[in-house]
From Swiss-Prot:
The lineage of its organism: Eukaryota, Metazoa, Chordata, Craniata, Vertebrata. One of its GO terms (biological process) is regulation of sprouting angiogenesis. InterPro entries: Tetraspanin/Peripherin, Tetraspanin_animals, Tetraspanin_CS, Tetraspanin_EC2_sf. Interacts with ORAI1; this interaction regulates ORAI1 exit from the endoplasmic (ER), and/or Golgi, and trafficking to the cell surface. It comes from Bos taurus. Glycans are attached at N111, N129. It is found in: Membrane. PROSITE patterns: TM4_1 (PS00421). Pfam families: Tetraspanin (PF00335). This is Tetraspanin-18. Keywords: Glycoprotein, Membrane, Transmembrane, Transmembrane helix. GO terms for cellular component: plasma membrane. It is a multi-pass membrane protein. The chain crosses the membrane at residues 14-34, 50-70, 84-104, 224-244.
Amino acid sequence: MEGDCLSCMKYLMFVFNFFIFLGGACLLGIGIWVMVDPTGFREIVAANPLLITGAYILLAMGGLLFLLGFLGCCGAVRENKCLLLFFFLFILIIFLAELSAAILAFIFRGNLTREFFTKELTKHYQGSNDTDVFSATWNSVMITFGCCGVNGPEDFKYASVFRLLTLDSDEVPEACCRREPQSRDGVLLSREECLLGRDLFLNKQGCYTVILNAFETYVYLAGALAIGVLAIELFAMIFAMCLFRGIIQ
């Protein structure tokens, strides 16, 4: 009976570690996606280190869980006491680190305010300057989503650097201009009328809602995965210790 129980724990340990392996791969994938996001949202909040820190934590935790899941599977199948003990201690450290990352993600979500984005835009935006990463990223977002500013075109009335560079000749940047719906090259309806602030030729929608939804998509996804991985890790630690004690006896 004791042998059957030990064998059952061994295979349960293997199953849990296989799920940890998959969870680590998912977290690793999300972390990579955040870092190489083609729409460039990362650069918009580059002044806030929480997003970058969170992405690196996802990468680190995903990579560790990926390797640790493989290690746990080997320890369970081979019934190696050293591997099991190392697995237990290591996964305990990761468990505590992930709790810290969850708190960090919660704090970061609170910083995604309309006021924060508006402040960053009015302070740093430089118009069509492609050499400035912040401005180029904002231009990419506004063109991609057909929006203008954080709240709307009126944001650029208070963008000090933009107003200085354009000598107040343009009401809005070119990225705010509406484009021909059927045009693959993004031909503007009327650049001149748009830059003069004519409503018919510029996008009136602010980008805040679009950006917030995009961030919340992978924040919630990462949070759901983290909760699932934490639960699996907890059971894996229990099975690892039970299997370790069973091997000793």
